[in-house]
Regions:
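Acidic donor-binding loop of glycosyltransferase active sites
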Residues: 182, 305-319, 330-333
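Short hydrophobic beta-strand element within catalytic cores of glycosyltransferases
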Residues: 323-326, 333-337
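Conserved acidic donor-binding segment of nucleotide-sugar-dependent glycosyltransferases
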Residues: 352-359, 367-372
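Carbohydrate-associated surface elements
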Residues: 190, 207-210
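Acceptor-binding helix/loop patch of EC 2.4 sugar-transfer enzymes
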Residues: 11, 75-94, 136-172, 239
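A short, well-ordered alpha-helix in the C-terminal region of glycosyltransferases
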Residues: 374-388, 395
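Nucleotide-activated donor-binding/catalytic signature segment of Leloir-type glycosyltransferases, i.e.
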Residues: 264-302
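Acidic anion/phosphate-binding donor-loop and adjacent secondary structure
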Residues: 148, 211-227, 281
C-alpha cells in the first residue's frame, strides 16, 4: 500500500548543516524518513550540490527536486541585497523569490500531495497558491521580532531605520501569509502564543527543540576538573554571517571580554562558524585578543569538547537556539542571556546560568571558571534533563503526527485558494 505523500518546500539547500534552521529541519526530516509519509523535498541547489550531498539527501527524503541557482559574485550579490531592501517585501523574502521555483512547486501541487510543508514563512513567496487543506508552515522564529531586536540594539541611526523598516515589512508578511496555511508549527509556546494573538493563525501547534544525541553524545565528556587560574577556554558556535551572532560577538568583544581579561588575562575564546566578517576578525587581532575564528568546520564537536564553558551572549534572536542543547548534550556548562535561552524549558541555576548585563556575564563566567565542580554538576543536570525529553527522534514523531492530522482526506478536491504576493 502506497504511503501518503508529503511535499516539503525549503527556501534553502539543507547541506552543509551549518545553521540552526538547517540543523533543525534536517533532524526532523531524518527522523521522519521511512515513516508514515513518502517525503519529496524541494529546494534550491546548484548543479553540483545534489551529487555532492547525495548520501545526506537520501537520509532525509525519498525524492529530491530542485530549482537551479548559481553562485553570484560579491558585487552582484551586493546589488541584489540593495534591490531587496527597496522591495515591498522583507529583504530576506525578496531574495528567496524565484519564478522557476514557483513553477516547479505548482507542478508538484498539481499532483495533489497529501500534505504540503513550507519551511519558514519565507517559503510562502514561492507558492502561487497555498492549498486550503493539508498545508503546513513550519516557523522557526517570529521573524518580525528578530528585526525589532536588531532595531533596538543598533547604535547607528541609519541601521535602526533599516531594521525598523524590515520589521514592519516582515510583520505585514507574516500577518498576511501565516493564516493562509491550515496549520502553523511553532518551536516554542512563546512563539505559539504570539502567532495566535497577533496574527490570528488557525490550527497552530508547537513542537519542542530537539538535539541529535547519537551524534553529540558520542563525543560527550565531563568538563575539565581543573582550569588554569590565569586562563580558561570559552566557546561560541553559530553561523558568523548571521547578524544576531555577529552582534553577540561584538558585544562580547567590546563589553564582556575586557572584564574577564582583567582577572584571567590568558583566557581564550574560540568562535566556530562559517564566514566571520573580516572586520571583526581584524578587530580581535588588532586588540591582541586571545581569540580564534575557525570559519566553517565539518565537525563542531571537538571544539565544544575542548572548551571549559559554552557562552551565548545573544542580544538578538527569535525561536529557540539548538546550540544550547548541543552544548548540553556534550556536557558543557552554559552561560547565556535570557534571549539565548528564550523558549527553552530549562531551569536557571540547575541547567544553565543566566546573565543579562556585561558585568553579570563576565562575573558568572569567572565564577564557573573558579569552581569547575559547580559547572560540571550543572552540565550533568542539563544533560540528563534533555536526554530524557528532547531527542530528535521524539521531536520528529511529534512533527509527523501534526502532519498526519493535517493530511488531506475527504476535502482534497476543494479548489486551492490563491495567495496574492506583495512586492
Amino acid at each position: 500500500m502506497a504511503r501518503p505523500r508529503l511535499l516539503f518546500v525549503s527556501p534553502q539547500f539543507l547541506f552543509p548543516a551549518d545553521a540552526g534552521g538547517k540543523i533543525r529541519t534536517g533532524g526532523i526530516l531524518r527522523g521522519m524518513k521511512g515513516g508514515y509519509f513518502e517525503i519529496t523535498l524541494v529546494s534550491p541547489a546548484t548543479t553540483e550540490q545534489p551529487r555532492r550531498f547525495a548520501r545526506e539527501l537520501s537520509e532525509i527524503c525519498d525524492r529530491f527536486l530542485f530549482w537551479p541557482v548559481s553562485k553570484s559574485g560579491k558585487l552582484f550579490g551586493a546589488l541584489k541585497r540593495m534591490a531587496a531592501l527597496a522591495s515591498r517585501l522583507p529583504a530576506s523574502v525578496a531574495l528567496d523569490r524565484s519564478r522557476t521555483a514557483t513553477a516547479l512547486i505548482a507542478d508538484m501541487l498539481a499532483t495533489q500531495p497529501d500534505v504540503v510543508v513550507a519551511d519558514f514563512v519565507h517559503a510562502a513567496v514561492l507558492f502561487d497558491r497555498v492549498p486550503p487543506v493539508g498545508s503546513v508552515v513550519f516557523t522557526h522564529n517570529v521573524e518580525a521580532e528578530i528585526f525589532a531586536r536588531h532595531a533596538q540594539t543598533a547604535e547607528n541611526p541609519f541601521a535602526r531605520m533599516i531594521w525598523g523598516a524590515q520589521r514592519r515589512k516582515m510583520a505585514e508578511f507574516e500577518a498576511r501569509h501565516l493564516p493562509a496555511f491550515a496549520k502553523v508549527i511553532a518551536v516554542s509556546h512563546r512563539d505559539l502564543s504570539f502567532f495566535l494573538e497577533t496574527y490570528g493563525v488557525r490550527g497552530a501547534e508547537v513542537i519542542p527543540t530537539g538535539v541529535d544525541f547519537d551524534y553529540f553524545g558520542a563525543l560527550a565528556s565531563p568538563p575539565p576538573a581543573v582550569v588554569d587560574p590565569r586562563g580558561g577556554h570559552l566557546i561560541f558556535t553559530g553561523s558568523m554571517d548571521w547578524p544576531a551572532n555577529i552582534d553577540a560577538i561584538q558585544y562580547c568583544m567590546n563589553e564582556i571580554w575586557p572584564l574577564i581579561a582583567v582577572t584571567r588575562p590568558e583566557a581564550r575564546l574560540t568562535v566556530v562558524g562559517r564566514d566571520p566578517p573580516g572586520a571583526l576578525v581584524d578587530k580581535a587581532r588588532t586588540r591582541g585578543l586571545n581569540w580564534q575564528f575557525t570559519g566553517f568546520v565539518d565537525d563542531v564537536r571537538p571544539f565544544i569538547r575542548d572548551a571549559d564553558l559554552y557562552i551565548v551572549p545573544l542580544r538578538v534572536g527569535g525561536g529557540t537556539r539548538i546550540k544550547i542543547y548541543e552544548a548540553m548534550a556534550m556536557r558543557r556548562p552554559v552561560v547565556s542571556t535570557s534571549i539565548g535561552v528564550e523558549g527553552l524549558p530549562i531551569e536557571e541555576g540547575n541547567h544553565f546560568r543566566r546573565a543579562d548585563t556585561a558585568a553579570a556575564f563576565a562575573e558568572t563566567v569567572l565564577q564557573l571558571l573558579e569552581a569547575p565542580p559547580q559547572g560540571a554538576e550543572m552540565a550533568e543536570n542539563a544533560y540528563d534533563f534533555i536526554l530524557k525529553r528532547y531527542s530528535n527522534r521524539r521531536v520528529a514523531r511529534t512533527f509527523e503526527e501534526i502532519c498526519r492530522r493535517a493530511a488531506v482526506s475527504d476535502s482534497r478536491n476543494r479548489p486551492p485558494e490563491p495567495v496574492a504576493l506583495a512586492g
